[in-house]
């Protein structure tokens, strides 16, 4: 794609995710989630993005396997389109949070999105490092379960009916989602991030200094955020449940 087509795809993607967010607004919302209607819409839209781009990233490597060997210049129309569509989503989500949530609540994600938009924007406009960007989007496979978990919490479906007050017990759906979330977190966030750091370090001599600095800063930020996120998930879904089980016995 040329630059004009790329910008059109990014703009069209941002508008499409905004439209999807609006459609979710008019769809039935679970009673408990109505107290946080904006959050429900935002997470639902994020789930759609994760489902789409996670599968899309896998297909990019399936149909263009040589991209694994050359993450700098090797790419296809499929991979270029994927990164452009994802850039549009992150622009939409950045604006959605900026206008609907306080800075104190959203500054971490706003910072994350700023880094992603900068890196993806560079990749789609120069048509370089698209393979590296597609690797980073494999993380979205984990995000599917992360967002599904959030929706279960927002809709009050974490615990089994009738156990919420006396002895809270997680529902089967929540338990499965939680374990899939933790498992894919280790595979598609931790392992992928480690591989990206290793690749960046191994190819530092072939990468311009400003891009190397951008990549290093971005991966450092995401590493810290992932560490904090994993601790929060463990504390909420494993440590708390273990403590409650011991207490009940």
Residue ranges and their predicted role:
Residues 151:
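Conserved beta3-strand ATP-binding lysine motif
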């Amino acid at each position: 794609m040329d630059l004009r087509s790329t910008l059109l795809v990014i703009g069209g993607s941002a508008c499409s995710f905004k439209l999807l967010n609006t459609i979710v607004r008019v769809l039935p919302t679970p009673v408990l989630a109505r107290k946080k209607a904006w959050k429900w819409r935002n997470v639902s839209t994020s789930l759609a993005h994760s489902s789409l781009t996670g599968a899309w990233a896998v297909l990019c490597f399936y149909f263009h396997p040589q991209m694994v060997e050359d993450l700098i210049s090797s790419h296809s129309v499929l991979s270029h389109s994927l990164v452009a569509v994802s850039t549009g989503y992150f622009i939409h989500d950045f604006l959605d949070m900026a206008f609907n949530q306080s800075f104190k609540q959203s500054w971490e994600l706003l910072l994350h999105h700023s880094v992603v938009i900068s890196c993806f924007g560079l990749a789609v406009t120069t048509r370089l490092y698209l393979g590296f960007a597609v690797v980073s989007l494999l993380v979205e496979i984990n995000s599917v379960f992360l967002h599904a978990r959030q929706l279960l919490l927002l809709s009050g479906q974490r615990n089994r009916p009738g156990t919420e007050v006396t002895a809270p017990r997680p529902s089967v759906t929540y338990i499965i989602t939680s374990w899939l979330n933790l498992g894919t977190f280790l595979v598609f966030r931790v392992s992928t991030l480690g591989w990206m750091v290793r690749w960046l370090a191994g190819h530092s001599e072939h990468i311009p200094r400003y891009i190397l600095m951008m990549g290093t800063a971005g991966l450092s930020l995401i590493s810290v955020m992932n560490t904090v996120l994993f601790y929060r998930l463990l504390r909420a879904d494993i440590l708390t449940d273990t403590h409650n089980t011991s207490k009940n016995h």
